[in-house]
Each structure stands twice: as structure tokens, then as C-alpha cells.
Amino acid sequence: MPKIGMEPLRRRELIDAAIRTIGQRGSLDVTVAQIAHEAGVSPALAHHYFGGKDKLILATMRHLLRELGRDLNVAIKQANTPHERIAAIIAVNFSATQFAQETIAAWLTFYVHAQQSDDIKRLLRIYARRLHSNLVFALEQLTSRARANRIAEGAGAMIDGLYIRHALGADAPDAASAIALVEDYIAIQLSGQPSAEN
């Protein structure tokens, strides 16, 4: 029987191990036993906490999205202007917890697996909608709503594209360059627009 009070710790260890295992293999073709071994626990304990691989994978993805949402809420609360809000959204998407080699590989694997999994597809759609709405909220204070939607769509595509590009590269992810590229894109798109920020 698992020790009382150990469940949250063990669940987190298994989720972290799932990110590492999926990231290392670049595939969801992993077993609960492999993830449990990476976490240093028994496969039986992993099954006890999650009930199987699919539930563990979904819990891992939800964990990454919760982390992203929590960090974003903190960053946005510190933003005082639309430009600061946009910068905060971009920076959080390329934070050290999200834009790490194994996490990037895990995200890419989730995108591929979404073609076969309605649950993963739904979670990715929630993520995309939240990113889009957060960007639009700030952008429409600087330009028209139609243009804000178009810029947000482009910025979201750039963020996803940069994750894919870094997943394919051998070098360590360069968050500063990624942030600069997305910020430059938004600045260029906004250039020549009358600013509503005063």
C-alpha cells in the first residue's frame, strides 16, 4: 500500500518521468513500466495512481497546461500595458519550464498523437484558444479587432512553429531568439497602426 501523504509526490514524479521518457523517445510508444522505472517506482504503483498509460499521458499534458496557465496568470498580473501583456504571454510560452528540450519533444509528440486521440486534441484546442484570446485581448487595445485576430493567429502559428523547429534541432533551445522573433513579428504587424495605448 502507498504511504499516506505520498500520492501527490509520487504522481508528480511519474508525470515528470513521463515528460522525460516521451521526450527522450520522441514518441508515445512508451510503457507504464518504462515511465515507472524512470521515476524510480514500481509499475504497479503507477497503475494504482493513474489506472493506465492513457490516463498518465493525459495527466502529463494537463500538468504542462496547468503550469503554463499558472505562470501566465502571474506574468499578466504584473503587466500594466497592452505591450507588456503581449510580451508576458510570449515570454511564458518560451519559459525554462516549457521550452526545455524534453518538454518540447513531449509537446511535439502530443500534437502528432492528437490525430488519434480526441482527448489530446481537445486539450490542444483549449490551449490554442486560450493563447489566441489572451493575445487578442491585448492586441485589440492597439488595433482593430479583425487585425488583432489576424496578428494573434500568426503569432500562435509562429510559437508552434518555433517549438517544431527546436524539436528537430540538436542545439539547446534558444528562448531569447524565439521571443525576439515573435515580438518582431507582432511589432511589424502593428507598425503604422494608430495606438490606443496612452
UniProtKB/Swiss-Prot annotation:
Pathway named in the protein's UniProt entry: Amine and polyamine biosynthesis; betaine biosynthesis via choline pathway [regulation]
GO molecular function, one term: DNA-binding transcription factor activity
Superkingdom assignment: Bacteria
Keywords: DNA-binding, Repressor, Transcription, Transcription regulation
InterPro entries: BetI_C (IPR039538), DNA-bd_HTH_TetR-type_CS (IPR023772), Homeodomain-like_sf (IPR009057), HTH-type_TetR-like_transc_reg (IPR050109), HTH_TetR (IPR001647), Tet_transcr_reg_TetR-rel_C_sf (IPR036271), Tscrpt_rep_BetI (IPR017757)
SUPFAM superfamilies: Homeodomain-like (SSF46689), Tetracyclin repressor-like, C-terminal domain (SSF48498)
GO BP annotations listed: glycine betaine biosynthetic process from choline; negative regulation of DNA-templated transcription
PROSITE patterns: HTH_TETR_1, HTH_TETR_2
DNA-binding region boundaries: 31-50
HTH tetR-type domain segment(s): 8-68
PANTHER family xrefs: HTH-TYPE TRANSCRIPTIONAL REGULATOR BETI, HTH-TYPE TRANSCRIPTIONAL REGULATOR RUTR
UniProt function note: Repressor involved in the biosynthesis of the osmoprotectant glycine betaine. It represses transcription of the choline transporter BetT and the genes of BetAB involved in the synthesis of glycine betaine.
The protein's name: HTH-type transcriptional regulator BetI
Organism name: Brucella abortus (strain 2308)
Gene: betI
